[in-house]
């Protein structure tokens, strides 16, 4: 590239960047078939998803800064209903859920915001973002032409819009919000819902438009989105997408930069060459707004993860879970954004002229009176190609696009990575933990907090998702004449559960454990159990691992033991215990005593030093530690533990489950060719998640309280505090 062209290019880019900052005054946001129009100017916009609750407020400024430095124009986020309205009419907009603060930080950085209100979000988030209390509103049917649902949805949507209006955060008020989204990926659900789904979709659109935000509304994966709402694309590739009207621009709301990690699954990785290829193809085919989902994934703190979703929501994003740059992904995409901006005058002025050079090569040229940009594409997955353009040869690697912002100089090729690869590693700190333990144990059926019902009950209807844990108790009375007492053929206990994990205790001892998976959260426990003459105490601890975040008829989804529960091998054959009298208890003793807090943990006696138990189920552990020096992100290495939850200074850093090892086929990864979430997997046979992020803002200089609840039984002596840093 000539020095003259490079200098000229940087001047143009600087002018474009400066113009993007000028939106602190009131502006008009419209659109035509080419692009969004802001203050009368068509824009090519690069966006990235950063979900505010998946990091801490202290992390937000740096994440937004890195997004801007990476070449983004827009930050995109969902709005998380269950975080903002934990109980009907009681709203929460503080700490990690301070949406207004997050939006203002985006504005201060000179970026726009795409506000996806939903309020259904999916997002691998607990219950898809819906508050669980919504399920128990009389007559409730989710996401269809149902009056109770529409009333609740409209109320929350209006709450968010009114709040943002009051803070003057829409672009037309001088704020950063240039787009709002209503519903989310409803198109596939609409067909399943039939006429009621169609009516609901129409109502949703009309309701949103009636809120008068002054900026365009969008609906993703909604082919029949009515005018003026823009229908948008989600997927790994969207170059072939066309909106449902020639008067609407081509917007891509989710370009998946990787994929989520599930407990029991391998870690997905999407090569940056393929991401860049997908973006270039979208732009060369007339796309004008592209959002990376995710640009920063973050962490599913607390119990916010969807069913079987790992605590880490890293997503193989350009900024990793800890807020560090993932290289070369971040820098390679940054260079792509620079060259797209250099092409912007041509891209927004004309439609492309397309020349086919065979089955697998194409040239897209955008030529106006004052500018020219060309995209040279090679779709072959195995062979490079040399193409001639305007009398000059250009060499294109397989599965790549070269971009010429002056129709002459190759500034960028999607498969030619110039940025260095920087590998991150977890380095143990000098922190030494001195552990104390407290035995949760199996409670009795007559202790405080238990209640009795005939037959089995659904778990979430009792817990209302305030805890992962729900106990089922019953007595099994064995007569002295039972034949198995003499033969030693212990009877077979079989339990069918809607999920997600189950611990079976017989007379206070763990008899076995069973658990499901994301692909099938239901489980069956079937095991011979040892019973004695007289009354035998059966205690079943049912454990939820998040609630489903996708699908239809949320009001029908169940968790816990619904039966049948049978005992086979008694004299009379098989006992169906499902309709017996059962006792129930919500949550754990340790939860009721708030053992995860300083006050709660100080109120009970803990076993110390040589008396600390290991490999024992239902055990609480605590220790204290000082914050290591430096500013590197911190994490807990939980490799020697089984399953449970972790708290630091009262903050729940999420569910841990390192004992659930990753299945899948991990092999060589070739960037070329169509990507899907099962391609380019890593860490097969290892824990799906070993390290758990501990935000530094949650720590004190000295005396931090670390509390762990361990369900399965682990060895806390193997836990270490590590720093994440570059090799």
Curated annotation (Swiss-Prot):
Its main location: secreted. The keyword Plastid does not apply. One of its GO terms (biological process) is carbohydrate metabolic process. Ubiquitous, with higher expression levels in roots and siliques. PROSITE patterns: GLYCOSYL_HYDROL_F35. Glycans are attached at residue 255. The active site is at residues 185, 254. Residues 1-27 form the signal peptide. InterPro entries: BetaGal_gal-bd, Galactose-bd-like_sf, GHD, Gly_Hdrlase_35_cat, Glyco_hydro_35_CS, Glycoside_Hdrlase_35, Glycoside_hydrolase_SF. GO terms for molecular function: beta-galactosidase activity. It is found in: Secreted, Extracellular space, Apoplast. Belongs to the glycosyl hydrolase 35 family. It catalyses: Hydrolysis of terminal non-reducing beta-D-galactose residues in beta-D-galactosides. The keyword Transmembrane helix does not apply. It holds the Pfam family GHD. The gene is BGAL2. It comes from Arabidopsis thaliana (Mouse-ear cress). Keywords: Apoplast, Glycoprotein, Glycosidase, Hydrolase, Secreted, Signal. It is an enzyme of class 3 (hydrolase). Induction: By sugar starvation. PANTHER family: BETA-GALACTOSIDASE RELATED. One of its GO terms (cellular component) is secretory vesicle. Its EC number is 3.2.1.23. This is Beta-galactosidase 2.
């Amino acid at each position: 590239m000539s020095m003259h062209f490079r200098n000229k290019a940087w001047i143009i880019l600087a002018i474009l960047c400066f113009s993007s900052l000028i939106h602190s005054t009131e502006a008009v946001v419209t659109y035509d078939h080419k692009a969004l129009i802001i203050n009368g100017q068509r824009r090519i916009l690069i966006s990235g998803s950063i979900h505010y609750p998946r990091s801490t407020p202290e992390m937000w400024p740096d994440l937004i800064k890195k997004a801007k430095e990476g070449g983004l124009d827009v930050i995109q986020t969902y709005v998380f209903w269950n975080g903002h309205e934990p109980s009907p009419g009681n709203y929460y907009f503080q700490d990690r859920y301070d949406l207004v603060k997050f939006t203002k930080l985006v504005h201060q950085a000179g970026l726009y915001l795409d506000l996806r209100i939903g309020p259904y979000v999916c997002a691998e988030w607990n219950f898809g973002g819906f508050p669980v209390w919504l399920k128990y509103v009389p007559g409730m049917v989710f996401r269809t032409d149902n009056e109770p649902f529409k009333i609740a949805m409209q109320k929350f949507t209006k709450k968010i819009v009114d709040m943002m209006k009051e803070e003057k955060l829409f672009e037309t008020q001088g704020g950063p919000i240039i787009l709002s989204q209503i519903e989310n990926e409803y198109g596939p659900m609409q067909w399943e819902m039939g006429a009621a789904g169609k009516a609901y979709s129409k109502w949703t659109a009309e309701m949103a438009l009636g809120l008068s935000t002054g900026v365009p509304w969008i609906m993703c994966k909604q082919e029949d989105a009515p005018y003026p709402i823009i229908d948008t694309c989600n997927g790994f590739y969207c170059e072939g997408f066309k909106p449902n009207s020639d008067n609407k621009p081509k917007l891509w709301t989710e370009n998946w930069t990787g994929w989520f990690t599930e407990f029991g699954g391998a870690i997905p990785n999407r090569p940056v060459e393929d991401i860049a290829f997908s973006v270039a193809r979208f732009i060369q085919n007339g796309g004008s707004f592209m959002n990376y989902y995710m640009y920063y994934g973050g962490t599913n703190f607390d119990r916010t993860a969807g069913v079987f979703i790992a605590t880490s929501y890293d997503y193989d994003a350009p900024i990793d879970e800890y807020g560090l740059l993932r290289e070369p992904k971040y820098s390679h995409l940054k260079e792509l954004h620079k060259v797209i901006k250099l092409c912007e005058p041509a891209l927004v002025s004309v439609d492309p002229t397309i020349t086919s050079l065979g089955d697998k090569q194409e040239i897209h040229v955008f030529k106006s009176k004052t500018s020219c940009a060309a995209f040279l594409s090679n779709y072959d997955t195995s062979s490079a190609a040399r193409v001639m353009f305007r009398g000059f040869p250009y060499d294109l690697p397989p599965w790549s696009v070269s971009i010429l912002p002056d129709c002459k100089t190759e500034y960028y090729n999607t498969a030619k990575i110039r940025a260095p690869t920087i590998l991150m590693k977890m380095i143990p700190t000098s922190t030494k933990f001195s552990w104390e333990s407290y035995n949760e144990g199996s409670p009795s059926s007559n202790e405080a907090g238990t209640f009795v019902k005939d037959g089995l009950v659904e778990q979430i209807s009792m817990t209302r998702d305030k805890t992962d844990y729900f106990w089922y108790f019953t007595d099994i009375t064995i007569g002295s004449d039972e034949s198995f007492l003499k033969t030693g053929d212990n009877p077979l206990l079989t339990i069918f559960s809607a999920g997600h994990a189950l611990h079976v205790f017989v007379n206070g001892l763990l008899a076995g454990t069973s658990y499901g998976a994301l692909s099938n959260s239901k489980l069956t426990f079937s095991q011979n159990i040892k019973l004695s003459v007289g009354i035998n105490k059966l205690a079943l601890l049912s454990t939820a691992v998040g609630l489903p975040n996708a699908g239809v008829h949320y009001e029908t989804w169940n968790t816990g033991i619904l039966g049948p529960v049978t005992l086979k091998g008694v004299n009379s054959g098989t006992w169906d215990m499902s309709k017996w009298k059962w006792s129930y208890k919500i949550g754990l003793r340790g939860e009721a005593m708030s053992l995860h807090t300083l006050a709660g943990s100080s109120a009970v006696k803990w076993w110390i030093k040589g008396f600390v138990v290991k490999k024992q189920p239902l055990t609480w552990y605590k220790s204290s530690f000082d914050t290591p020096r430096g500013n590197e992100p911190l994490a807990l290495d939980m490799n020697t533990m089984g399953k449970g939850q972790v708290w630091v200074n009262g903050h729940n850093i999420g569910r841990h489950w390192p004992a659930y090892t990753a299945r899948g086929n991990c092999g060589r990864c070739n960037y070329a060719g169509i990507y899907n979430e099962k391609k380019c997997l890593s860490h097969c046979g290892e824990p799906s998640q070993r390290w758990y992020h501990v935000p530094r803002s949650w720590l004190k200089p000295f005396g931090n309280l670390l509390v762990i609840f361990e369900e399965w039984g682990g060895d806390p002596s193997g836990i270490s505090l590590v720093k994440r840093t570059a090799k």
